[in-house]
Amino acid sequence: MSTGKVVQVIGPVVDIAFEAGQQVPDINNALVIDKGNGQSLTVEVSLALGDGVVRTIAMDSTDGLQRGMGVVDTGNPIEVPVGEATLGRVFNVLGEPVDNNGAIASDVRRSSIHRDAPKYDELTSSTEILETGIKVIDLLAPYVRGGKIGLFGGAGVGKTVLIQELIHNIAQGHNGISVFTGVGERTREGNDMYHEMEESGVLKQTAMVYGQMNEPPGARMRVALTGLTMAENFRDNEGKDVLLFIDNIFRFTQAGSEVSALLGRIPSAVGYQPTLATEMGQLQERITSTKKGSVTSIQAVYVPADDYTDPAPATTFAHLDATTNLERALTQQGIYPAVDPLASTSSALDPQIVGQEHYEVATEVQRTLQRYRELQDIISILGMDELSDEEKTTVNRARRIQFFLSQPFSVAETFTGINGEYVPVAETVRSFKEILDGKYDDLPEDAFRNVGAIEQVVEKAKTMAQ
């Protein structure tokens, strides 16, 4: 093993020199710095500067580092535990348990976090719909088992709540393995998630990996790869169907941009790293389904300043099968989940996949909502009286549809005081077909707000009439 010394520390970036005649570590190798007092710091090689000097990114705080400290090359990239031993546990970026439930046994298999994506001939595609129980998603932007799904939204529009509800609805009914990866998000949310999973009994089938907001950019940059490596092992070596939740994929990009300038790279658009598309591609191409097993990934994507043209969310869009867009204007109307029914997309909304009736109902719902959006300018200037009878009917139905696309979530019961609702796809399609047919035109609009099945609307209308 090569040994070297720390020669420069700039924030999370550490330069290390190896003497002449020693093997210079490869790119992505993990090096261990001895900080004394039994403490060590793991860093990852990013650049070879020449003359035996390498530039590395620290996976933890560089506080207390001094020039001249000894460094050992491990000879391998960061390796994390994989397999059954990871279930029910919480790990950091290095695969070290952080849940105070004891160390992982030394004989547990470990795997490098840097791997090639599966080869083209190993891939497989699926057309099986993944039922979420959330009306707006199942109807208008359905998810595919083994697909890649993005939840896009600005700050505070409900991405994490939606991902928690999807974990509640899918992971609890899914007998396979789940991997949850917290990338640069709030530690409090991670703690809440752990306890909720523990109470619901899902934890024993779940591996959790966290690199949260308070951690250095190195940890936030690599923690997504740690979680993905654990998911890949279940897929490739155990032939399992895996659910991979990532909250938030934007922080992966953000961490890369934080260290990019320190590594000496010239920034590109909006200050992002010039390697943005490459880094995103390397991560996303590994999240896929093969002939051995599937990985269904659900990724929250923060949209800076609600700007979808920002390079980070724009780069992510290209890799996804379905997108669920959360819209701030809908939260202001009190419609939760605040999913934009016209901007959300899915490659699975196809009559050959979802069936002819589902496809026709979904497209008619979108057409009605689009017509309502076009008429809103006329309504705001001239009022409803200027519309034709047909247009008035369209507007009234569109408003009922818009309210009926909301529903109470199980994970938000403590805030709302309303029991969460899970609505099967067949029920969702039938309900919206009946609304489009005018069966419920006489019921008040407010009866459609924040309910599950259409029968609850009828009950609510009766209660309101009393």
Swiss-Prot record:
Enzyme class: translocase
Keyword ATP-binding among record annotations: yes
A single Gene Ontology CC term: plasma membrane
Alphabetized GO MF terms: ATP binding; ATP hydrolysis activity; proton-transporting ATP synthase activity, rotational mechanism
InterPro entries membership: AAA+_ATPase (IPR003593), ATP-synt_VA_C (IPR055190), ATP_synth_F1_bsu (IPR005722), ATPase_a/bsu_AS (IPR020003), ATPase_alpha/beta_chains (IPR050053), ATPase_F1/V1/A1_a/bsu_N (IPR004100), ATPase_F1/V1/A1_a/bsu_N_sf (IPR036121), ATPase_F1/V1/A1_a/bsu_nucl-bd (IPR000194)
Membrane topology of the entry: Peripheral membrane protein
Protein task: Produces ATP from ADP in the presence of a proton gradient across the membrane. The catalytic sites are hosted primarily by the beta subunits.
Family: Belongs to the ATPase alpha/beta chains family.
UniProt name for this protein: ATP synthase subunit beta
Lineage summary: Bacteria, Bacillati, Bacillota, Bacilli, Lactobacillales
